[in-house]
Regions:
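N-terminal lobe/hinge region of extracytoplasmic solute-binding protein
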Residues: 71-120, 239-243
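Gly/Pro-rich hinge or "lid" segments in bacterial periplasmic/extracellular proteins
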Residues: 102-107, 179-198, 202-204, 208-276, ...
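Periplasmic-binding protein-like
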Residues: 154-158, 215-217, 308-309, 319-320, ...
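Periplasmic binding protein-like
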Residues: 70, 138, 301, 422, ...
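N-terminal secretory signal peptides
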Residues: 1-31, 50, 54-55
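Structural transition elements
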Residues: 364-399, 414-421
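Extracytoplasmic/peripheral linker and loop segments enriched in polar/acidic and small residues
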Residues: 198, 345, 433-447, 470-538
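Long beta-strand-rich cores associated with HINT superfamily self-processing modules
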Residues: 534-558
Length: 558
């Protein structure tokens, strides 16, 4: 690669240092790719400097046309910023696009953006919109559209989880002047300044942060961060305006969604005429039957109970990828039963994570360590493995005033079925320390009514390319997706420090403190990391299993 130090410094002052660390063996190729592209180096240049060939999308089949049908839950899609699962976003992303895209290789590239540029201190990010992108109504995408979306995402009235990714950087807490039932001040969130999101010109937006933030490109691909046309007033549905390769022509909640290829797409024209998402319900056997009979051509994602059956279906290929997908039994620390951190740690020590992985996920993945940072994350720090320790768990319960244990209830979903299997295996292990947990297995649609309410519940969390992302989303004080109601100023400060630390090795040292804090005082029992897989008919070309189970139908053909 012919880029010299001056060329690299024009992109970002830290890039020459990254190249040196790569050459000296202090930074592996994977971390170099992720970090250099985050600073604005093109993926092609980063791969070349790393001495690797860039992954190439499989060429489209010569024949255009046809329909691909995917088995996937069809849930509400009206308000993308408050999406809380991948299903809804997989419909939206065929109609609308994101500013960036993190590929199956975990490298983030511009999508609706032409490029981004970070200031030396990572406090200012300049986003440049691609010129000439047309919405389906003929309007050209511009900076005003992007500013409208960014501002809406960070409006506390909308209630988007995106706030958690920008907390401290663009968003701050403020006292609303109201009191809660306990007499404590009710806090809200707002942009720290009316200059936080700045339109520079017709195609340029500047994010003026008050703290450093390294993960802006990845944060812009958080699945609720769909770019909508302001004329649709924030509502996505049949006939909505989009920049994507398809138009939503039919939507029936809980049954199906139909999308048709549109003319005028700014990227490479999609090969397929139509994509259909078919809802086969909670029963894993129904999706397998649909795939085996040819009613569908593939599944968004398969569960472990379907694995053996998938292997037996003719003309079906199993696609698999290592991920940071997981499930956590989160304990709400503001509920009396889980206020004492010793009780929360005892719940962790009761679990044999390797056994849960084998029982619930056929051993496909890795045992987790109760801190929600995965081995696939660049900043993961390898601690001594947290082994099951029944005696220590009982001792902690006794110290917390529960020498005979206690009774409680855990809520979980029926689909995907591995979740209830994992919970069942943990329930049996908790019995060994005198904690009797009743399982309440709900239909998936009903679970989300209990998600933020119950003291103990098991929630599936999807993959994120950086460990700091999921921690910011789930455990920062007051963020919308903080299902455990966890509030720890020390963790908040450590996350702010990690978010501002570009150097992977230095960030890993910060993450060590975070991981230890989560194991000692945190609000979760986390048994496993999942390898994600699915089955797809061989006739579907161009499909790649994404670690977040995202689907990109414009890449497929027959």
């Amino acid at each position: 690669m012919s880029l010299d130090k001056r060329d690299l410094e024009k992109v970002h002052v830290e890039l020459p240092k990254l190249v040196d660390q790569l050459k000296e063996g202090k930074l592996d190729r994977r971390d170099f790719l992720r970090t250099s592209t985050r600073l604005g180096l093109t993926a092609s240049a980063a791969y070349a400097l790393a001495g690797l060939p860039e992954p190439v999308q499989e060429a489209q089949a010569a024949t255009m046309g046809g329909t691909v049908r995917i088995s996937m839950r069809v849930i509400k899609i009206e308000n993308p910023p408050i999406y809380d699962y991948v299903y809804d976003s997989n419909i939206a992303r065929q109609v609308c696009d994101y500013l960036t895209r993190t590929g199956s290789d975990n490298v983030t590239r511009p999508s609706l953006l032409e490029k981004w540029q970070a200031s030396d201190d990572l406090k200012t990010w300049t986003l440049t919109v691609k010129k000439g992108i047309k919405w389906s109504n003929g309007d050209e995408l511009n900076a005003d559209h992007v500013v409208w979306n960014l501002t809406r995402w960070l409006d506390e009235k909308v209630g988007s989880s995106i706030i958690g990714l920008f907390k401290g950087f663009l968003v701050v807490d403020y006292d609303t002047g109201q009191k809660d039932a306990a007499g404590k001040a009710k806090m809200g969130t707002k942009l720290y300044s009316d200059k936080a999101i700045e339109k520079v010109d017709e195609y340029t937006i500047r994010l003026n942060g008050q703290t450093a933030q390294l993960a802006i490109p990845e944060n812009l691909f958080h699945y609720p961060a769909v770019i909508l046309h302001p004329k649709d007033n924030g509502v996505l549905g049949v006939g909505s305006i989009g920049t994507g390769a398809f138009t939503l022509t039919e939507f029936e909640l809980g049954k199906k969604a139909v999308l048709k290829r549109r003319d005028g797409y700014w990227g490479k024209a999609a090969a397929l005429d139509e994509v259909q998402f078919i809802d086969n319900g909670d029963d894993p056997a129904a999706a397998i039957a649909a795939l085996a009979s040819g009613q569908v051509d593939g599944m968004m994602e398969a569960s472990t109970s379907q694995y053996a059956a998938l292997q037996k279906i003719p003309n079906v290929v199993i696609h698999q990828v290592t991920t940071g997908q997981t499930g956590v039994a989160r304990m709400q620390e503001d509920k009396e039963i889980f206020k004492d951190p010793r009780i929360r740690k005892a719940m962790r020590l009761a679990i044999d994570c390797r056994k849960v992985l084998q029982i619930a996920h056929l051993g496909l993945g890795a045992p987790a360590e109760h801190h929600h940072v995965a081995p696939v994350h660049p900043e993961y720090y390898k601690l001594s493995f947290m082994q099951q320790n029944i005696a220590e768990a009982k001792k902690l319960l006794a110290e917390a005033g529960k020498p005979d244990g206690f009774d409680c209830e855990i809520f979980c979903k029926k689909d995907p079925d591995w979740e209830a299997i994992a919970v069942g295996s943990m329930v049996n292990m908790w019995k060994q320390i005198g904690v009797n947990v009743k399982m309440n297995v709900l239909p998936s649609a009903q679970y989300w009514d209990h998600w933020m309410v119950e003291p103990l519940a098991f929630t599936n969390w999807t993959h994120r390319p950086l460990g700091v992302m999921v921690l910011d989303l789930a455990y920062r004080t007051g963020v919308p997706w903080n299902e455990s109601h966890y509030s720890n100023p020390k963790l908040d400060d450590l996350l702010t420090k990690a978010d501002a630390t570009l150097d992977v090795e230095k960030r890993r040292q910060v993450m060590k403190d975070i991981e230890e804090l989560m194991q000692e005082e945190g609000p979760i029992v986390q048994p496993l990391w999942r390898a994600v897989f699915t089955g797809m008919n061989k006739k579907v070309k161009g499909f790649k299993m994404h670690p977040t189970s995202y689907l990109f139908a414009e890449e497929w053909s027959l």
